[in-house]
Amino acid sequence: MIYWFTGQPGAGKTVLANALKQQLENTFHIDGDDLRDIFDNKDYSEDGRRKNIALAQHISHFLSKKGCNVVVSLVSPYKDQREEFKEKLEDLIQEIYVHTTDIRGRENFHVKDYQPPTSNYINIDTTNISVENCINKIIKL
């Protein structure tokens, strides 16, 4: 199974992804910042972002086919790219939209062209809910 955490920087994607990883067996975590470091991708244009997302999609699909659970934490702002991946994998992926109204110091990194999901996703507002409760909501679905 692939658990794809999407949302603005500072919403809690990586925190929740790490917590979910601890609850699942045979799980690999792919983080967007790590991918950028490994592949030296400092291109934050739409094209650069799309390439980083496509890379995460290919790696997560590969690992999933090998029997791993995969947890991805990545802004992944483009709805069309996420929807296409969900259509391809059908029941093998769960999109998790993480958002908050809290100010957490990463507002300068917000992606102006972020497109929230509109269908077939788990909605997690981290403003007033504990990490444990967020993870319980994800696991129960």
Residue spans for each PLM region:
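Walker A (P-loop) ATP-phosphate-binding motif of ABC ATPase nucleotide-binding domains
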Residues: 2
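Hydrophobic anchor at the beta1->P-loop junction of P-loop NTPases
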Residues: 5
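The conserved Walker
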Residues: 9
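Walker A/P-loop
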Residues: 14
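Conserved substrate/cofactor phosphate-moiety recognition/catalytic segment
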Residues: 17-61, 65
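Amphipathic alpha-helical transducer elements in NTP-driven molecular machines
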Residues: 46-57, 79-82, 117, 128, ...
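Conserved phosphate-donor/acceptor-positioning beta-strand/loop module used by diverse small-molecule
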Residues: 71-77, 88-104, 124
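Small-molecule kinase domains that catalyze NTP-dependent phosphoryl transfer to phosphate-bearing small molecules
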Residues: 98-141
